[in-house]
């Protein structure tokens, strides 16, 4: 058994070393939209991606993948802290799904290059009435990504009507699994009423649009297929994901892709964005853009210099500093962080979206604070 493990370990090292000397090349897998950056895009990417001009936004830049072992792999990185970073890329032609049985697949890769304290990273499909209008942010139809802030840590999925008045959120979402310095890949599959979420090529969530979403409005509207005009959760999802314009008020038609990142720290790196209508093509895209990167990021780099005595001392100092930093962040998160982050989640990002799996943590925190106050007041006497 030990011999077998030893063999596989060194096979990974050899494979990693082989990949290390190769150059990243964008794959040519069919898609509705695919963005894979290289050094050739340094001067041209701004012609494909634009930012709304009526907002105080952060700045993006196209840089070589930080810590990457593949030469010439590039991506977009955020440069400002505590600023929303928004970019929109128009599709060459507006696209509409042919039937509800055709899967909608949306995928992207994200890598926090600095500690992720609080923030989100979304990739959205948008519907713009005037794609050339850069004065405002277009409404999202499907918003997919990650959100990690204090006790909140999950993969976020929202489906929104074209007018923005109907919005449904996944309430039992899985954890994000984000790790500083590591690339995470997230893939969304919507087919009929089934929702599947993949993280790093593994299925982490399977649900149904009629039972696993909430925050639907209870408003009366006129609709030809609903006799009483009442929007149930399943009806909303059917309307939003359908393309039959004769029977649905909300056909699935999009003409743009949006990046939306906000974080307390800069340095959120995003690349390898994919949108299409084929699950098999999406899996090929995952294989060609992520497998090599995953192996390399999880393998020791064979080109690292040997550690000298002075290097050992610096490593020890760095370890001690890191421990104190982690202690400080832990105290901060469990005191002021809870209060601030809760306000952030309730009012800044998604209104009243509150994942059900975090409710117990919220209750325990509230009870702990409630019990601590009388003790604190007693000690002051």
From Swiss-Prot:
Record organism: Schizosaccharomyces pombe (strain 972 / ATCC 24843) (Fission yeast)
Cytoplasmic-side segments: 325-359
Residues in the Lumenal compartment per record: 17-303, 381
Residues that carry a glycan: 133, 192, 225, 243, 246, 287
UniProt xrefs under Pfam families: Calreticulin
Listed name of the protein: Uncharacterized protein P4H10.19c
Disulphide linkage map: 118-149
Alphabetical list of PANTHER family matching this protein: CALRETICULIN AND CALNEXIN, CALRETICULIN_CALNEXIN
Membrane-spanning segments: 304-324, 360-380
Single GO biological process annotation from the record: intracellular protein transport
Cell location: Endoplasmic reticulum membrane
Family, per entry: Belongs to the calreticulin family.
Keywords, in A-Z order: Disulfide bond, Endoplasmic reticulum, Glycoprotein, Membrane, Signal, Transmembrane, Transmembrane helix
Cellular component GO terms held in the UniProt record: endoplasmic reticulum; endoplasmic reticulum membrane
Presence of the UniProt keyword Glycoprotein in the record: yes
One example GO MF annotation: calcium ion binding
Membrane topology: Multi-pass membrane protein
Signal peptide per UniProt: 1-16
């Amino acid at each position: 058994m030990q011999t077998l493990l030893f063999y596989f370990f060194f096979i990974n090292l050899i494979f990693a070393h082989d990949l290390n000397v190769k150059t990243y090349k964008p794959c040519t897998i069919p898609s509705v939209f695919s963005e894979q950056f290289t050094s050739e895009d340094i001067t041209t990417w701004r012609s494909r991606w634009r930012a709304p001009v009526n907002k105080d936004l952060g700045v993006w830049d196209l840089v070589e993948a930080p810590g990457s072992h593949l030469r010439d792999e590039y991506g977009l990185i955020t440069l400002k802290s505590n600023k929303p970073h928004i970019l929109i890329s128009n599709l060459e032609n507006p696209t509409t799904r042919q039937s509800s049985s055709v899967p909608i697949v949306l995928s992207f890769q994200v890598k926090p290059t600095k500690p992720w304290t609080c923030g989100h990273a979304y990739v959205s499909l948008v519907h713009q009435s005037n794609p050339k209008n850069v004065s405002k942010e277009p409404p999202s139809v499907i918003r997919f990504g990650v959100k990690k802030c204090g006790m909140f840590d999950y993969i976020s999925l929202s489906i929104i009507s074209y007018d923005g008045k109907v919005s449904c959120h996944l309430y039992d979402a899985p954890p994000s699994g984000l790790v500083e310095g590591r690339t995470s890949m997230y893939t969304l599959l919507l087919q009929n009423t089934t929702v599947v979420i993949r993280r790093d090529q593994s299925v982490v969530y399977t649900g149904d649009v009629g039972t696993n979403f909430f925050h639907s409005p209870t408003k009366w509207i006129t609709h030809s297929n609903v006799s009483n005009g009442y929007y149930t959760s399943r009806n909303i999802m059917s309307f939003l994901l359908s393309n039959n314009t004769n029977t649905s008020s909300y056909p699935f038609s999009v003409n743009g892709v949006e990046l939306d990142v906000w974080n307390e720290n800069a340095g959120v790196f995003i690349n390898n964005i994919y949108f299409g209508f084929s699950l098999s093509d999406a899996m090929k895209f995952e294989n060609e853009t992520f497998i090599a990167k995953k192996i390399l990021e999880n393998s020791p780099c064979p080109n690292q210099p040997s550690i000298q005595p002075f290097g050992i001392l610096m490593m020890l100092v760095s370890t001690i500093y890191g421990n104190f930093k982690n202690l400080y962040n832990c105290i901060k998160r469990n005191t002021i962080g809870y209060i601030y982050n809760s306000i952030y989640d309730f009012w800044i990002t998604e209104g009243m979206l509150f994942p059900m799996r975090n409710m117990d943590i919220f209750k325990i925190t509230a009870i702990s604070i409630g019990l601590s106050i009388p003790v604190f007041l007693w000690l002051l006497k």
